[in-house]
């Protein structure tokens, strides 16, 4: 029992240490979310036509400083363990990033003409053939833009045109052939569906794994006079990441021994939150641009995705922390119960022992009295005989 108590106490100590480690990670993520939120505000400002490119250049300098801090946050460590650099993740399978739109009509496919597009309620987006379509996307830290006339082009053509303009097959439109509620499979092997289970239209990255990751993209519709059509723009920009890009990797999750037996452990997968991991920095080290209005609009989408990634990770960390706290309470209760049981078996029952002592003492005293009386009687009898 002594060994069991010590084992339970050590397991409890492990859970407390694990919680402390996760609090360090959570602090870094909270700070990163604050920074990304501030950057989104600046990107929104940079997307305003009232600013000149020289103004945006000053914003870019500030952007770069903030993203330097994001990278510093990703290097936070606990006892020499770099928690947020992406090294400690569970086994994953390679996935191709997917973006799904559930703002357009449920029967929308890649073959639907832009002029025929409707919103979820079936109301026309009123896109005219003379309207201009501007598409911007961020990949490997670089922003690509293209503008063309709507004409009789289709939804699929939006992505094919920007592939042609950028000279890179950034998007794979084969998945847009049909509208479906099933999107694909994520890095853990689970099927992914639209949030409400209704049909949506999905476009995928042109390359599997993180090499093909699109940090974000925006689609803007303007009329021939240059006025933005907000309803159409909002509906077309309703593509959100439904499957994250992931490379195949082995299991390297952090492990906390939370029990006294082999196998009673808890694995914790913690993803990276560096600017590169969030799609905000290219392989050349350069950060995303807000140098032009179009770049800034694409940056807004990229920052939205980055914020969601960190918040998802923070939610996971919160779940790990809650489990460790409940486990610690359970281990503490077990330790107390085993200690009490040990005391019952080993330690003396004081009340019982006092009662037994008093009883034995009375018996001894009675015996001594009887012996003394017997001695007196013997002496008296001998005196009579003498």
Describe each model-derived feature in a short phrase.
Residues 8, 42-43, 338:
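Non-transmembrane amphipathic alpha-helical segments
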Residues 1-13:
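Short, charge-rich amphipathic alpha-helices with coiled-coil/heptad character
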Residues 306, 313, 317-320, 324, ...:
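Amphipathic, heptad-repeat alpha-helical segments used for oligomerization and assembly
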Residues 16-321, 347, 369-372, 376-386:
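Amphipathic alpha-helical coiled-coil/heptad-repeat segments
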Residues 330:
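Glycine-rich phosphate-binding loops at beta-strand->alpha-helix junctions
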Residues 352, 357-371:
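Short, highly charge-biased, low-complexity peptide segments
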């Amino acid at each position: 029992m002594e060994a069991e108590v010590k084992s339970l106490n050590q397991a409890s100590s492990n859970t407390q240490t694990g919680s402390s480690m996760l609090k360090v990670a959570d602090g870094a993520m909270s700070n990163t979310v604050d920074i990304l939120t501030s950057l989104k505000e600046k990107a929104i400002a940079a997307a305003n036509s009232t600013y000149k490119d020289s103004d945006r250049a000053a914003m870019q300098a500030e952007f770069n400083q903030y993203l330097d801090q994001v990278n510093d946050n990703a290097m936070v460590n606990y006892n020499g363990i770099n928690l947020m650099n992406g090294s400690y993740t569970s086994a994953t399978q390679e996935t191709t990033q997917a973006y799904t739109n559930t703002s357009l009509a449920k029967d929308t496919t890649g073959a639907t003409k832009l002029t025929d597009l409707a919103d979820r309620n079936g109301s026309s987006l009123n896109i005219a053939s003379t309207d201009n379509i501007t598409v911007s996307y961020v990949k490997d830290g670089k922003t690509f833009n293209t503008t063309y006339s709507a004409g009789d082009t289709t939804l699929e053509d939006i992505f094919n045109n920007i592939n042609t303009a950028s000279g890179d097959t950034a998007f794979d439109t084969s998945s847009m052939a049909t509208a479906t509620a099933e999107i694909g499979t994520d890095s853990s092997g689970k099927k992914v569906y639209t949030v409400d289970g209704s049909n949506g239209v999905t476009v995928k990255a042109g390359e599997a794994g993180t090499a093909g990751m699109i940090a974000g993209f925006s689609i803007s519709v303007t009329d021939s006079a240059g006025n933005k059509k907000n309803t159409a723009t909002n509906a077309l920009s309703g593509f959100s990441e439904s499957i994250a890009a992931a490379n195949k990797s082995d299991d390297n999750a952090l492990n906390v021994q939370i029990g006294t037996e082999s196998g009673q452990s808890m694995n914790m997968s913690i993803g990276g939150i560096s600017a590169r991991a969030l799609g905000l920095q290219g392989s050349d080290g350069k950060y995303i641009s807000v140098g032009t209005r179009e770049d800034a609009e694409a940056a807004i989408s990229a920052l939205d995705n980055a914020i969601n990634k960190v918040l998802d990770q923070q939610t996971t960390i919160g779940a790990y922390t809650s489990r460790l706290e409940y486990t610690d309470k359970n281990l503490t209760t077990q330790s107390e119960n085993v200690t009490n049981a040990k005391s019952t078996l080993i330690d003396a029952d004081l009340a019982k022992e006092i009662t037994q002592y008093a009883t034995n003492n009375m018996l001894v005293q009675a015996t001594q009295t009887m012996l003394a009386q017997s001695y007196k009687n013997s002496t008296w009898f001998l005196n009579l005989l003498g």
